Amino acid sequence: MSKEHVYEIGGINFKGYFAQANSNEAPCVLIAHTWAGRDSFVEEKAEELAKLGYHSFAIDMYGEGKIGSSVEENSSMMQPLLDDREELAKRVLGAYEYVNNLDLVKSNSIAIMGYCFGGLVSLDLARNCSELKGAVSFHGFLSGPEENNGEKINAKVLALHGLKDPMVGQDQIDSFSNEMTEKNAEWQLHVFGDAMHAFTNPEANDPEFGTVYNQKADQRSWKMFTDLLKEIF
């Protein structure tokens, strides 16, 4: 099967990246990208997951596979979706439905993981898709939409957070914890004491901006994630 898949949502073409596991009918893990777009970072994660026996699909939240090249460009692509969580949910649900209909993917056996902005995308899919099996956020934004649908969250939820992340304050943590509890989710929040934002990205090295790679947090969070996949599937 080809790596790049074009799927349409609301008249816009989106370009996802599919990494195929050795087995034919297998579960699939969606990967939601950072604010930079569907770049090589998430494609490499997709290939890693395929080696572990899971099909993986790096979704495109911006359309046409757009990738930003600066902080300003990344922000300009991400912000409209943060401002319109209904549109954000529509796009990630569209990706879920596309993948769920692929012959190679075991029906209704899908989880999602995401980084930074993609962490929020992952959690929003859990908030809006009752069939989702798991949702994992790596140093992601935790705040829910202003319009709370109040529906129970069926997916197993794992949030992996750096204590020194300046982009996610205690207010987000408290709000997330209350929401997950109110929605009867099976949820976990792990805090890495010495980690900042983007702790899984080896290229992150900007303490003033709050983004710094942390090898131990990277390795430990990946193990927690893959252990959850084994439990789910």
Task: Give the ranges of each region predicted by the language model.
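N-terminal cap/leader regions of alpha/beta-hydrolase-fold enzymes
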Residues: 1-233
